[in-house]
Amino acid sequence: MKKIYYGLMLAGALTLCTGCSSSLLDIDNPNEVTNDTYWNKPEDATAGVNACYSFLYKEGTWMRWLSFRYDLTSDEGWSSSPWIELGDWTRFLYNNYNFYEGNNIHWEHFYVGIFRCNQVLAHVPSIEMDETTKNQVLAQASFLRALWYFQVNLLWDKGTMPLEPKDASYIPEDASEQEIWDQVEKDLTFAMQYLPESWDAANLGRATKGAAKHCWARLICNNISMTRQRNSCNG
């Protein structure tokens, strides 16, 4: 009797195993978001540019260490910190270029911000949506990318300059200081064209035309060749 019982169990198991198709396991994960599945709706464009703004408030940007580095290497402040390496950086004593809080964290967070802007600028143009809203989204991403590259040049006088999304295997080449300034000017020119003068109450805090003009004015002040070019044109 036991032999019959075990035989039936074995036959049933074999039937189940041979009756299942391997394709049943090949299903899409509904929780996995990819570039192919995400950038489809106007709401995706808005959420994408919102993600660009989020890196304005990170430890490597204006939440903490960037303000620390700018203020304490200027005439506006000084450091009496017992943290020797941190104090050295505020006095332009760069003994360790891998010092995370003084250098690496800025590079890391700037380029994550740039990557997010590149995502928006690459994928939003193909979304079917109101053209005015689309251009405003693209203008915000352009402004923020210009802002990040502006910081790259202020701190390092050059850097890499990816302008579209790349995978993890991509190794960008260095761009010169002038190449970065030129790209900043290009992004700001687009931003000044399409950003609004102001936003409604629900969108306060987004970049405006005035913010782009202010950044463009700072660009001219920091870029000697651009200043000379404009002076010669005006003269």
Where are these regions (language model features)?
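Bacterial Sec-dependent N-terminal signal peptides
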Residues: 1-30
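Membrane-proximal, proline-rich intrinsically disordered regions
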Residues: 20-67
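Short linear capping/connector segments at secondary-structure termini
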Residues: 30-34, 96-98, 163-170
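Conserved, well-structured interaction surfaces
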Residues: 46-50, 54-59, 83-156, 171-179, ...
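TPR/TPR-like (Sel1-like) alpha-helical repeat modules
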Residues: 233-234
